[in-house]
Regions:
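Helix-loop-helix junctions that connect adjacent transmembrane helices in secondary transporters/permeases
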Residues: 147-227
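Alpha-helical support elements that line or immediately flank enzyme active sites
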Residues: 54-82, 116-136, 197-266, 323-333, ...
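Flexible, low-hydrophobicity surface segments
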Residues: 1-158, 162, 177-180
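Glycine-rich and small/hydrophobic secondary-structure elements
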Residues: 99-126, 246-299, 356-362
Length: 362
């Protein structure tokens, strides 16, 4: 076989520019800086649009003894009201494990947990109607901190341990032993564009969902699951987001599911734009961590052994906490070398909102 010459081998092949030294703009850069970029709330609203608000738990943990929504249904502008019993499919909207309920049923597990949802002709009237609900609770003991969860062995997932060498021997034989604890607080994502979803019923009985979501495929899957329809009957669209940072990875699906359920029930377009004050209490944040360590060191400051306890405040469900606490454990040695170590990672279950993804897991 004849060998190709250099000219022949390169014929028809375009050279690839490295990009170094070139001005490579974002595909929507001009739209962003001129204000022409359309976010979900900028889309022209259909004339029959309904708006959503939710009625929320006012206690951290308890059983719902009675729920009277008669006044809510009769309130001005209200078109529809739903509870978990109105969900035709599966009300569990968990991203990985189970327990993340679309709406509370017999028990509430954190302050702000949605119990029912209202669709009205304006967001103001929907919010006003929610205040008319009459709810009676039976208070139950609440676990609110990592320390309380550790004491009561309350966990969303089993504890994991990374072990290397004989930690006890290494620490006891060290010249110095250092012990301390550190409480790393959580953090709100505070994206500029809030949580929002627009659901449009389609002519074939399905729904077209436009949402501000980092995971539009999960939105499609969970909306179909909640509605009890085939996945091809749900079109999920995300053009852009005004920030996410992990806060719209698993959290955005709830809004899409509620808006879609109202859209299918009423054959009308529905927008669920969560007020910022609701976002602050209803959606997950960065995990708090309560960390303790005991380390053996030499006179030269060299670490010879470490016992470390990392307790992540996961909230009421697992959500994405498995990987988040794992990541904290993976990074526990930082830039140091531990000849002997035991790292324990606790996924603490508390009666607080279920914490979620945030840039820089763990």
């Amino acid at each position: 076989m004849r060998k190709l010459t250099n000219n022949e081998a390169g014929a028809g092949v375009n050279s690839v520019a490295s990009g170094m030294g070139d001005s490579l703009s974002h595909d929507s850069a001009i739209k962003h800086v001129t204000g022409r970029a359309q976010y979900v709330d900028d889309i022209l609203e259909p004339v029959d649009l309904l708006h959503v608000a939710t009625g929320q738990s006012t206690i951290a943990h308890g059983r719902i003894k009675s729920l009277n929504l008669d006044a809510v249904r009769l309130a001005e502008g209200v078109v529809d009201v739903i509870t978990v019993s109105d969900v035709p499919g599966d009300p569990d909207v968990s991203p990985v494990y189970t327990g993340d309920m679309l709406l509370a049923s017999a028990e509430v597990v954190y302050i702000g947990q949605p119990i029912f949802a209202v669709a009205a002709i304006s967001i103001e009237l929907a919010k006003k109607a929610c205040l008319q609900a009459k709810i009676e609770y039976e208070d139950l003991e609440a676990v609110l901190t990592p320390q309380q969860a550790l004491a009561s062995e309350s966990f969303v997932l089993p504890t994991r341990s990374f072990v290397k060498g004989d930690v006890g021997e290494a620490i006891e034989s060290a010249t110095h032993v250092v012990e301390a604890q550190l409480h790393v607080r959580g953090q709100e994502h505070f994206y500029l564009e809030g949580q929002i979803s627009l659901a449009l019923p389609t002519e074939d009985g399905g729904v077209h969902v436009i949402s501000s979501s980092q995971h539009p495929s999960e939105v499609q899957k969970l909306v179909a699951s909640v509605l009890g329809v085939n996945i091809h009957q749900v079109q999920s669209e995300t053009r852009r987001m005004g920030g996410g940072f992990g806060g719209k990875e698993s959290q955005a699906a709830v809004l899409a599911c509620i808006a879609s359920l109202f859209a299918i029930r009423n054959r009308r377009s529905v927008k669920y734009r969560m007020p910022r004050q609701d976002d602050m209490v209803q959606t997950g944040k960065r995990h708090d961590f309560w960390n303790r360590y005991r380390a053996g060191v030499t006179d030269q400051g060299v670490i010879v052994g470490v016992q470390m306890e990392l307790a992540g405040l996961c909230g009421c469900t697992a959500d994405l906490s498995e990987g988040i606490v794992d990541r904290a454990m993976f990074h526990a040695d930082n830039a140091y070398y531990y000849p002997a170590a035991r790292i324990n990672g606790y996924r603490c279950k508390t009666n607080t909102v279920s914490n979620t993804a945030f840039r820089g897991f763990g």
